[in-house]
Amino acid sequence: MPLDSATPHKAKRIPFKVDIAGVIEIMGTSLYSHPNTPIRELLQNAHDAIMRRRARDLTYHGRIDVLQNADARTLTFIDDGIGLSSKEAEDYLGTLGIGITGLIKKEATDVFDISMHSNKRDGGNLIGQFGIGLFSAFMLADKIVVESLRFEGEEAVRWEAGAGTDIELSTSDRTSAGTSVTLYLKPNYAIFADDAELVESGIKQYADFLPIPIHLNQSNARSNLIQAAWLEPTPDNDAVEEQIASYFGETPLDVIPIAVEAPVAIKGALYVSPQRTPGFADDATIAVSVRRMVISRHIRELVPIWAPFLRGVLELPNCSPTSNREDLVRDAVFDSVCDSISDEIYAHFDELTRNQPHRWQSILHWHRYTFAGMAIHDEKLRVLLSSTYKFITSHGELTIEQILARSRADALVESEADFVVWYNADRRQESWLNEFFSNSSSPCVHTLRSFEETLLASMLGELTDEQVDLRPASPSSSNFCESILGLDERIDASDEWHTFFDSLDSNIFIASSPSKQPVLAFVNERYELSKTFDDLRENGELPKGFQRLIDQHFQRSPAGKNEIILNSEHRLVRRALEQGTAHPLASVLRILVIAALSKAGARIKSIAQELQSEDLESIADAL
């Protein structure tokens, strides 16, 4: 029977159902990644209680104690802060998602405004927010006991909870204001009641900068540092560098002090690590504290992507931690912090280039390829490097400005380009090309990393509005033979000589050169690469899918060949060319050609090596 569209659907409302015991289990075991997290959460609660009491009593300072009891298998956190009333304990301690600190912050402002002073926006110096920190203790404990007396209150309260759903409230014998939280540890976490070094490590990891002394097992010495040099109103640079080295266990190449008040507050220091990053995918990791409580020592995305070599520690009071307090929320405040940090880094490095050039060059040299590779995608970084980054050239290390100044085109042979910049991307030809360019006023830039070629082109395009032609240092490039090699007209060798040199698979030319070299050889990098792939294919070491991609690439853009120039000004070459390929001098010439190719870094085929042996025998017979 068809349904009548006019028939009303039956509906009913049902409430969400929550398995409280299950939620507590999740809160205690799955929300946090490390078992020492409860140390952070309970120290945070103690800190907030003390800060709230300080707001009411200007003569009060406050103290946190952490006590271990191996016999009772307990770990206790004690503060002399504002404490809890019986009603507050009942309303807040056992309610997930509602915390006193969070409510105070919410009352401070319900409207986000990045320009609002932090004390108004977030409840001042309070850290807590989510009302879930106490439940992290179930990660270590199967029972929690809280005893508290409200500041200026009359009756202390005792709050006890296990892993189930029931909470027991009663009166307590506590006589002084403050709170104690005792964890009755699970057997597999008994080490937290016995190992003082383990607990102190957790205190230092999370609470080293809290402005409240924390004492372990009633020790007279506090466990936390409290005030680091980089948090001082006027930091001492030497002290900052010394403490950075101690905190991170490595000596900084340079320290970047950060002190920003608006639009967001940032305080701390970054430093240039001596550790070279292996690639460009590595991210800088920064230790971050929020209102002095360390969130993590591995916060990513705070510094520009081009600076993976930066490390440091920053106090970011305006940022919001994630619910597990192990990272920062990526929001408008976070973006504003990143922009401010980026501006500070650029400004610091720019100041170094002008006032401490030797220090800047040391940093630039140490992280050379990271700077060069990242500058391709960052215009501000390219501007920073344009007057300081030194390319390796045939005339020594030169900046892009110096390269351009030496590369003015010869108007007699160049009708369109105002500048001609020569470059070489093959390390094997570096010394060989340096010989040719030693007599030229123009340098050859050795872009031995692929990104350096792109960086060179980008910088040249931004440096001048005049026409700049970037050319490979190769005989196939316009005017290379005439301008650099000093060759007269270059002609193709005859078919007879091409056949004679066929095993070398090279283009053979004849020209008159002032060079004393009988043979000039130039390696085509793409040709050499194609032959490497051919060898892999023949040995069955190239996956078929990859092979198809390679074939398609070289079909679209043929590899070309290596190039040989026979110097007709050289007496031996001239006589060999006159006598022809049947004369023993042809064998001598082929040996010279193979030697020139080898010097330039070319791969010599096995058949050519066999012919070389035959040539030696032919020469011996002729003698």
Where are these regions (language model features)?
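GHKL/Bergerat-fold ATPase module in large chromosome/replication-associated machines
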Residues: 126-129, 147-166, 186-190, 195-623
